[in-house]
Curated annotation (Swiss-Prot):
Consequence when changing residue 493 to A: Decreases mRNA deadelynation and decay
InterPro entries: CCR4/nocturin_mRNA_transcr, Endo/exonu/phosph_ase_sf, Endo/exonuclease/phosphatase
Name of this protein: Nocturnin
Residues holding Mg(2+): 363
């Protein structure tokens, strides 16, 4: 290799190869045609182009002269035999009469060239196959059809024009759905909200009129975000195997320890300060009757309440390390702030300083680390990965990402849990859910907690897909929880104006409310809203926080609410919620940053578990494992428990 070539390759780096010569046409790639590299490349990089350099490469060998009859290896030409096969072709066809008549004069004696020209320019309908059986014709047709179908799919998924046509068609379908609902007298869950892409409530919709997209399009949508064109790298969660923590550390001591580890002897920016929406005690450092921690150097939040039937829930998308560092494109976040060595200790601080009883996490791809650290503080965890996590298509991944639930073992007892891969129109998607039944050790009362992470990306089709995932989620949690009080939380990737929000709040099977929307309301107003479903959802939507995620990516700045904590109002009383930092606190570069490890903010809610009503039942029927204590509950078919 000459010096020019070597220099060019060095400039491109080890992952990217320089493109020399002409590119092979897409049709040739679909036909699996092998090209001769000698016909494409030049070693005289930087030299003047020759006259032949602008000519397209020859994908088929065309001989200038036919073999002489006097040669020993001469065989009479037989155009019915295959001496130059295409993929999917079993025979050599005779050129059609048009090509024989209109062929240029210099090609008259070159039958192979005329034959190739005919195959390129003419369809099979104008040529008569020779010497083929019916079975051969059928197989050739099927193979040609597969090629045409592959080209059509590629065009359908990449064409901007066709994408607009599909979205326009979906808009008409949504309008048709609403017209049918009105004609049939089906009440819309949000009849006073102009969505443009609304949908009926999950469990009460008219199934026989539901739109179901073509299966090919559906499979494309549910897998969108997984890098299927790249090789899959099935790594396991092993990057934190060497983690060693001092034994017997209390929570304050552990927080101080991780602060020192994060700084490495150098002072680092402190975690963002946050407060609760309702005022707490004036002196947060008083430990009389409360398990409060002296955390003013970290945050001004108070630890979990000590009343026997109070529950503190922390919901958080912690940002997958693999995706955040290698794929999500946080253009304003310093590279060092995205490293796992920096982020993991901030994640621990954000969780432990709030002292939650139940922790629900999404985008977890370092479960062993959390299991080790939180396990030292008497938490136990359940993890369920995505079936086709996009992390697995990125080099140096730490295994798949998924959802996790942790619970405080000295306060709560695991009675059973279940996991599910959410389905969309009876097709498994790439999103998952976990549900767990927990029992209060102090009173014996039970409640269920469920978490999920719905499909990301914008657009009417994806909003409809999320809504269908929500319907399947409702069926799953209702079957598991029965009449037990329910906490349903997660990253729903949908703003309140999307159909999934109304689907969950308007579902008569669950009768849920939104914790952050209800926290400042009177108890009576929550239990008796005096409004129909549409008005109830509209009011709740307006009371949601302005944002739960605030980030800057390559495509622009995103600031919206897509994370929620839903609860059963008649059995759980919302007492307080952790507020979100203001824009000036976050900084102009937004999140993630040196002061916050994720692009989502954690949601922290305090609930009081109420005694059952006269018509209610303390525990409902549901699926999952049952046992007397958490050590007797084994892992489900898909999940893992530690």
């Amino acid at each position: 290799m000459d010096q020019k070539t070597t220099g060019l390759r060095e400039n491109y780096g080890h992952r990217r190869q320089p493109a020399l010569g002409k590119a092979m046409p897409v049709t040739a790639l679909l036909l699996n045609l092998e090209s001769n590299p000698l016909d494409y490349s030049r070693n005289d990089i930087g030299a003047e182009l020759l006259e032949d350099d602008d000519k397209p490469p020859q994908l088929f060998s065309v001989t200038d002269e036919p073999p002489s009859p006097n040669e020993e290896d001469y065989k009479p030409p037989n155009h019915h035999e295959d001496d130059g096969k295409l993929a999917g072709e079993r025979h050599r066809e005779i050129p059609c009469s048009n090509c024989l008549k209109t062929a240029p004069g210099h090609l008259i004696d070159r039958q192979s060239a005329i034959n190739e020209m005919c195959q390129r320019l003419c369809g099979p309908e104008c040529r008569r196959p020779q010497g083929l059986t019916l079975d051969g014709v059928r197989q050739d047709f099927l193979r040609q059809y597969e090629i045409a179908e592959a080209v059509a799919k590629t065009s359908a998924m990449t064409s901007t024009v066709q994408m607009k046509q599909r979205l326009a068609a979906r808009k008409l379908e949504f309008e048709k759905e609403m017209e049918m609902d009105e004609q049939l007298g089906v009440a819309s869950p949000r009849n006073d909200i102009n969505l443009g892409q609304s949908s009926t409530v999950a469990a009460t919709g008219m199934g026989e009129f539901e739109f179901e997209p073509p299966r090919d399009l559906l499979l494309y949508l549910v897998r969108m975000g997984s890098f299927n064109s790249a090789p899959k790298i099935n790594n396991v969660d092993s990057q934190d195997d060497g983690l060693v923590l001092p034994s017997g550390l209390s929570t304050p001591a552990l927080l101080q320890h991780v602060q020192q580890l994060r700084g490495g002897g150098i002072e680092q920016p402190s975690l963002l300060t946050r407060g609760f929406l309702k005022p707490l005690l004036a002196d947060e450092d008083v430990a009389d009757g409360l398990r409060c921690l002296k955390l003013n150097s970290v945050s001004r939040v108070c630890s979990a309440p000590v009343e026997g039937d109070d529950i503190r829930l922390l919901q958080w998308n912690i940002l997958s390390q693999t995706l955040g560092q290698h794929n999500d494109g946080f253009v304003r976040c310093p590279e060092e702030a995205l490293t796992w060595e920096h982020r993991k200790y901030l994640i621990v601080q954000e969780i432990l300083q709030n002292q939650p009883d139940v922790i629900c996490l999404q985008e977890v791809d370092h479960f062993k680390f959390l299991q080790t650290v939180l396990g030292s503080q008497n938490y136990a965890g359940i993890f369920f990965p995505k079936p086709d996590s996009p992390c697995l298509y990125i080099e140096q991944n730490n295994g798949p990402d998924g959802c996790a639930i942790f619970y405080k073992r000295d306060k709560l007892q695991l009675q059973g849990y279940d996991t599910r891969i959410l389905e969309v129109w009876r097709v498994q998607s790439n999103q998952v859910a976990i549900a767990a039944r927990l029992r209060m050790r102090s009173s014996g009362r039970e409640f269920c907690v469920a978490t999920t992470h719905l499909k990301a990306r914008h657009g009417a089709l994806l909003a409809k897909l999320r809504n269908e995932q929500g319907r399947d989620l409702i069926r799953f949690v209702k079957q598991f929880a029965g009449d037990t009080p329910l906490l349903l939380c997660g990253d729903f990737n949908a703003e309140p104006v999307e159909p999934i929000y109304a689907t969950i709040l308007g579902c008569d099977l669950l009768r849920l409310g939104s914790a952050y929307a209800d926290v400042k309301l009177d108890r009576e107003e929550i239990l008796h809203p005096n409004a129909d479903v549409g008005e109830f959802v509209a009011k709740s939507m307006k009371r949601e926080p302005p944002y739960t995620t605030w980030k800057i990516r390559e495509e622009g700045e995103e600031c919206h609410t897509i994370d929620y904590v839903f609860y059963t109002p008649d059995r759980l009383k919302i007492k307080n919620c952790l507020d979100f930092p203001a824009g000036e606190q976050i900084g102009k570069n937004r999140t993630p940053s040196f002061q916050y490890p994720s692009d989502h903010f954690s949601l922290v809610c305090d609930f009081e578990l109420l005694p059952p009503t006269e018509n209610g039942k303390e525990s409902g029927s549901g699926s999952g494992s049952d046992g007397e204590n958490e050590t007797e509950v084994e892992g489900s078919k898909h999940g893992s428990i530690q």
